[in-house]
């Protein structure tokens, strides 16, 4: 390069060209451009940006030598530098790049390296320095200087040392001076994402005032630095430019100003550049070139090594293929033999399993056929029910069309419901065989025509019967009129039923013979009933209770008599409780009607029946017009009622006809009557049977020729078909639509606004302690497991279980109502025993007893007693000089004299009693004296006083202390007048704030029944008799206490009170008694206990709440109806009414009909009767009790409609007061759940418009169990039961797993023993071949090879299971390898292996090269990637005893696999054949998801009977292989003797052994 530059400067003189290889080398190693760019970047001066012309500034630094070579050499970098500096000074964008990056881009990159987000004015100079290129130039310059290793002058060394000392000085100063610590993180904070400089400064300096002072100090320091810099500049004129430049850089570090623009940059000389270049070349030659050469050599050696390894592996594979080909030729015959043996085993197992499985499959097919027949019968019954409903709908449509004069637009829609849209059904049975059930022959058009014909015939028959009845009635009436005209008592009115005067839609006025004013809705109801009568249609008047159904019926009969001249006979049938009400209403509103009350005893009814003459009926002068009777009497006297042709039959409370199988329903249906009217306050029943019953009753013509529906409900087909819900939802709604034209229902809130309001209040009562004990005792006897088991039983068991459970429910309800219902408290007395007296002889009495009443002896005993007063005196005050101790020395310190001591011990019980009283009295004074009266100076005395030995007073629990301290009074058993048994926690409830609080350690008194406890046995004390007069006297004195005064003190407390006690009856204010008479019990001294009436109230929470409620209601002037379901409870309520002196009346099922009328009338007319006790069933129907304004349900009924009827006895027309209904409910008991169920029942009634009688016996066992158990308790028990069941299943699973392991181990052991025997006998075992990677499924001749499989099942997640003892398919496993079982769970995870291109398979074009449906390239080989033999094993060791063992294991596993495949195939074939034998159409095109996928025809070859899908359970344990004998996918074998490849290609489906 130097030569070229020199030639260019000499004026273009030519030089010889260098050799070509030198030019290539120079061109490859040319670094001119790189060096220029590097020098421009690193040699640029810091102040180059401030200079105007970089080129001019750089020229003076060039050496002054006039060598043009040096100038030319230095010119390019200087010009480049000048261009760079010029561009920088002009403020334009840099046009050159620094290492390929623009200068503006480098500044942006530098800005990204620092955090300038919180940078303020004081640190702006750091930003300019960090973003400028000066630091890089200085660093590059310093690096160049270091590389050049220039020798430092003495002055430069001194400067460096001075700067180092200066630096250390300021570092020490910074560390000591706390004010300088504010500059911590001054520049280091810019390198972090979070700049802590200002936070540190604020922490050290505090407020801003201090900062201002610091800034002033800083400015002063900066002035000093500037002055010092000026002095250095003056001195620098004598120093070298290098030192000056170094100092400016140093001062720039301590100041905010850049170095002055006058400084010049020093440039290197040519010699220095050449030396640096030579140094770089030496480094390249010495270091880089040898390193590159070594890397190339190592790479070549590695390549050669890999090539050798690859060649070795290729050689080994080719050798293995050759060996394998030779081995295949030898093993062809043994393989064929083994194949034949396995096929024989396969068919043997096939036939065995087929026979066994066929029997089981035939049994299953028979059961399936029975089930299909049952389903078909259920479907037929359902179609029959649909046919009957459709037929009834058509009949109702004809009737309503006639009545409403409508058009025939709904007929086709009704008939369309007979169409059957069911399709052919397929069922997957256990074996996976698809069964096609044959379609039944159902012609919807035929049934449509049949239903239409039946409905039209029934309609015409009904019309004909109506006309016939009218004609007969006309003739009977004419005959009666002729007879009356002859006698002159009749009238000449003519009437024709054929031409009625009333037309549909005409408004009918109120009859004039009706005394009263009908309301608007009642008049509409009468018009509707009259219209039904004209058309000959029966109807149901289902107005809500209390709206006047009775009045509307009477008005209809009055209308017929007045407008149509039909005076009967009319038959009214009602419950026994409303008979008198009907009689009263007829007498009140239509007095012209002659009403015949048909009830009483048989003799009375016989007398009444004398007026039943057909000749005298049908006229106004008939002996009777209306007959009123009850349902019971109709059934009893049915033969008499059937003789009369009734014009109108009215059935009150028609819900009694809910069952079509009842005798009452059948009898009433046989009556001869023109029209029937059903009155019911409850809606239509909510079961299909009850709806059918009502339909049949109001439309008997339609069902006279049909008996199917009776059989339908007797067999309970709905539950048997198990589709009851569908029938209920669809057909139940259709039945309601059928009844709609014949039913009229209004409710109170829609038609009547004059009725007062009705308020219902739930009163929750707490159980008493006695009730809780009984309730819990009953609950403890219940076995929840038995309940759950009984509730889950069959339908036959449900009926028996429900009755027993309902009995249990009634016991709980009894306890809730009153414990007396469950266990009545009777009068109780102990067992009294009279002991025989003991007879004592006179001699024994006189001489045998120690103490007798002998006064002379007693006197001497008192004189000689040690307690004699003179003896005590002598012992205390003995003579002087005798120092004897006395046993009575303590008397002087307890304040008792010798005489008092003698009286206490010798004068008897009375004296001791008096002494005890005086001592207790004195103890009070002594206690007060010791507590309050002791002076301070006498607190320490020397001698004892006369009361110092009375220490009992000082005891904390002494009687005076207990009486004076209120805390000690409350101690247990510290007082004789309190029955405190302990301290316990009490919950205090506050009614106003509805809160409760717990108070601990409160006094707990003994229960009252413990205080009046009576002994079980009592007896008079044993008495003795003696044949001695003195003995009797002494016995009498002893019984009286020794003296009369003692007796008086014991009984009366004092002798003075005895006279007052005897004269107490004559005194107006007698003195209170004392002694034993004052503590006489309330019930006397006798132990006989008679339960009080107060306990009758307090023992029941409900009765206690009722007592409080009745007291309040009586004071406010209300009158009350009390309903209860239990007559025994009404008996208890009667006892309560007598005890509280409430006037009451009682009506229940035992009341006579005549008495009921009088009781209702008395309650309505007499205001002094406060309470009416009624049973819910007997007193809740039909009667009018509007005099009462309060209804109390002591217990709720199962059916909410029954309670609704009962409360409507008071809330009905005529009630002017507000009616309040109270319902008593025991909290937390079975009654809450019964009430909840009743609410759900009423909600269903409102939704479906179908209410009805809810009988307890219709409850299911599960529903009764839900009443007995709480939801939480039931859930807890069920959870425990499920947990126990789960644990039991887990235990059984473990046992089953253990049993299978033992069975498998035993089987394995037997197989091993069998193999050992065969080995000893010398049986030739054929070692199976190990196929190579190239010819996996081919023999030497290209034949398909048989692949045997392991009999063990694979992992459920594995795709391939490869055993070390059985190498399947094309897995190239080394015989000497010790690898064990390999399970590949994900074939996609293994990398595909490349195959050799020179394999025989690829040459011959084999079609099948897969194992288990997976290509060999996708299967990881056990031996692939390893050497031909295992480590440490010599060559040629592959055929060892271990290999023989492998062959034996393979043979056994292959046989077991064949047997298993044959068994499964036989089972599949047996199942298909068995179902086909019972008439099922078995489809051969079975989907892949079927569990058993096999053809039903026995195959002629091996490829015809195998499974056809990889997902079949009959496939191989290698789950996708299907490698079993007979698989058409893998057993594409031909004879081993046919080497032709054409035969191999066309050999699919052929049998090498010629079939079986």
From Swiss-Prot:
Ranges for domain DBINO: 280-405
Region called Assembles INO80 complex module consisting of conserved components INO80B, INO80C, ACTR5, RVBL1, RVBL2, residue ranges: 521-1556
Protein's UniProt name: Chromatin-remodeling ATPase INO80
GO aspect biological process, one term: positive regulation of DNA repair
Subunit-level organization: Component of the chromatin remodeling INO80 complex; three different complex modules assemble on different domains of INO80. Interacts with DDB1. Interacts with transcriptional repressor protein YY1; the interaction recruits the INO80 complex to YY1 target genes. Interacts with YY1AP1. Interacts with tubulin alpha. (Microbial infection) Interacts with Epstein Barr virus (EBV) lytic switch protein BZLF1; this interaction participates to the activation of early lytic viral genes by BZLF1.
Bias (Basic residues): 219-230
Stated pH dependence: Optimum pH is 7.
Function: ATPase component of the chromatin remodeling INO80 complex which is involved in transcriptional regulation, DNA replication and DNA repair. Binds DNA. As part of the INO80 complex, remodels chromatin by shifting nucleosomes. Regulates transcription upon recruitment by YY1 to YY1-activated genes, where it acts as an essential coactivator. Involved in UV-damage excision DNA repair. The contribution to DNA double-strand break repair appears to be largely indirect through transcriptional regulation. Involved in DNA replication.
Alphabetized InterPro entries for the sequence: DBINO (IPR020838), DEXQc_INO80 (IPR031047), Helicase_ATP-bd (IPR014001), Helicase_C-like (IPR001650), INO80/SWR1_helicase (IPR050520), P-loop_NTPase (IPR027417), SNF2-like_sf (IPR038718), SNF2/RAD54-like_C (IPR049730)
Sites where the protein binds ATP: 543-550
Signal sequence coordinates: none
Location within or outside the cell: Cytoplasm; Nucleus; Cytoplasm, Cytoskeleton, Spindle; Chromosome
Matches recorded under SUPFAM superfamilies: P-loop containing nucleoside triphosphate hydrolases (SSF52540)
Region: Disordered, residue numbers: 46-87, 219-249, 1283-1316, 1388-1408, 1420-1461, 1499-1556
Stretch list, region Assembles INO80 complex module with putative regulatory components INO80E, INO80F, UCHL5, NFRKB, MCRS1 and IN80D: 1-266
Compositional bias ranges of the Basic and acidic residues kind: 1283-1294, 1303-1316
More info: Although the ATP-dependent helicase activity displayed by the INO80 complex requires INO80 ATPase activity, it is likely that the helicase function is carried out by the other components of the complex, RUVBL1 and RUVBL2, and not by INO80 itself.
Protein's UniProt keywords contain DNA repair: yes
Positions of modified residues (N6-acetyllysine): 118
Polar residues bias: start-end ranges: 1390-1408
Tissue specificity comment: According to PubMed:10574462, widely expressed. According to PubMed:16298340, specifically expressed in brain, liver and pancreas.
EC number: 3.6.4.-
Lineage: Eukaryota, Metazoa, Chordata, Craniata, Vertebrata
